[in-house]
Amino acid sequence: MYTALLQSMNRLHPRAWDFIQLVRLDRPIGIYLLLWPTLWAVWIAADGSPSLKHVLIFTCGVILMRSAGCVINDFADRNFDGHVARTRQRPLATGRIRTREAWALFAVLVALSFGLVLLTDPFTVALSFGALAVASLYPFMKRYTHLPQLVLGAAYSWGIPMAFTAATGRLPLEAWLIFAANLAWTVAYDTYYAMTDREDDLKIGVKSTAILFGAADRAIILALQGLTLGLLLVVGMRLGLGPYFHLGLLVAALCFAWEFVTTRRREPQACFRAFLHNHWAGLAILVGLILDYGI
């Protein structure tokens, strides 16, 4: 139904679907994976009572910046995507969208995002430039390092300190603990994602943690997910969070265990399902937080 609704946008413009695919609105998993930890920070920074203004700013900002990130990613990969089965039909790879059109869309998305951050405070505005820099850098890192997922982790975690500065004007230790937890989690789930393309990436020279970790990939992913839960547990202890938060962490742990078991044969589709499944872990933690503060 959601996809059909997006495809109906072609009635407004014959190329609408191409641009929807470019910004991945047809695949909202990236929005979820970026949104849940950002909202963890929004709730914790506001001691469980965030303003509607901040919830809307960060939710809309996530959607816009994730879309901008997809555009710059596809621009960077336009000469590689045609050689990978999963990506060869992307609009820039096929030429359905021209590079100058992609750059124009990227500029519009970034401008809209900046308009949102201007509704906060100078400290948060200053941090937003770092967010743009890291998000723009990530797509090019896979050419030079086996750790592009680490840069993606920083990009996907940048909204966390911004949420704290917007709500409190400062960056307490909890902000950095959540940042580190989310960075570890992002590296973990994006390694599952990279495992789906590992054979193609080896052929074309694209680097990733999936290639770097080799046969230890699943064990390292599980360790990173354990680190995520451990750091969040420390946050919970420091803030005196209660049983609902810990229940959310338990549900997340069960999600991680399921992913570990189902990827034992490293089949690409199983790895991709494990990647998708991670958003349920993030949502469980958010629901636990909201319930813990609200009850």
UniProtKB/Swiss-Prot annotation:
Single GO BP term: ubiquinone biosynthetic process
Q: Which domain of life is it from?
A: Bacteria
One MF term in the entry's GO annotations: 4-hydroxybenzoate polyprenyltransferase activity
- Pathway entry: Cofactor biosynthesis; ubiquinone biosynthesis
Cite the entry's keywords alphabetically: Cell inner membrane, Cell membrane, Magnesium, Membrane, Transferase, Transmembrane, Transmembrane helix, Ubiquinone biosynthesis
The record's listing under InterPro entries reads:
HB_polyprenyltransferase-like, Prenyltransferase, UbiA_prenyltransferase, UbiA_prenylTrfase_CS, UbiA_sf
**Principal subcellular localization:** membrane
Q: Does the keyword Transferase apply?
A: yes
Taxonomic classification: Bacteria, Pseudomonadati, Pseudomonadota, Gammaproteobacteria, Pseudomonadales
Q: What does this protein do?
A: Catalyzes the prenylation of para-hydroxybenzoate (PHB) with an all-trans polyprenyl group. Mediates the second step in the final reaction sequence of ubiquinone-8 (UQ-8) biosynthesis, which is the condensation of the polyisoprenoid side chain with PHB, generating the first membrane-bound Q intermediate 3-octaprenyl-4-hydroxybenzoate.
Name the family: Belongs to the UbiA prenyltransferase family.
Q: Which organism is it from?
A: Azotobacter vinelandii (strain DJ / ATCC BAA-1303)
As recorded in Swiss-Prot or TrEMBL, the protein's gene is named ubiA
Its GO CC terms? plasma membrane
PANTHER family assigned = 4-HYDROXYBENZOATE POLYPRENYLTRANSFERASE, MITOCHONDRIAL (PTHR11048:SF28), PRENYLTRANSFERASES (PTHR11048)
Its localization reads: Cell inner membrane
NCBIfam families from the UniProt entry:
ubiA_proteo
Cofactor(s) needed for function? Mg(2+)
Reaction(s) catalysed (UniProt annotation): all-trans-octaprenyl diphosphate + 4-hydroxybenzoate = 4-hydroxy-3-(all-trans-octaprenyl)benzoate + diphosphate
Q: From the Swiss-Prot or TrEMBL record, give the protein name.
A: 4-hydroxybenzoate octaprenyltransferase
